Amino acid sequence: KDRWTYITDGLKITIIVTLLALIVGLILGILIAMVRCTHDQTRPKWFRSPGNFLLKLADAICRLYITVIRGTPTLVQLLIINFVILVSAQKITVAVITFGINSGAYVAEIIRGGIMGVDKGQMEAGRSLGMSYVSTMKDIILPQAMKSALPALINEMITLLKETSICGYIGLNELT
């Protein structure tokens, strides 16, 4: 009877960490994907403005984030966040933040691929109807991009569920 308590408690923690990290990763990934795609589509090359510079800067920061996070092992990220950045935080918070940041980089590329897969004419149609960039992206582009990106997002969720097994390295007792 006591063993089942350990298993169910571990399963609860695994599911909580996975779902919360998935939410953080989706929010972060969608925002980063929109920044990355905004840089490509908003203004002609000849147009120079402070906003254009800020978009280029934001795009460069997002590219650096994606490169660093995707190029670093998740265990290393977990240990750095636990022992260097969030030393006094609860272990479950550290796990959610770490896996959310990690998942955000992968989700950003998945969503960006979905957005780039939508025909350019869809953005032009929305803009020609007088919609702002954000409303065109939210109402026209993202629903189509999510449809094509859904299988890869499900794979990312499964990967995230498997990655929670390394939480034991920071002393979080979960399912594995």
Which ranges hold each PLM region?
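Transmembrane alpha-helices and adjacent helix-loop boundaries
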Residues: 1-176
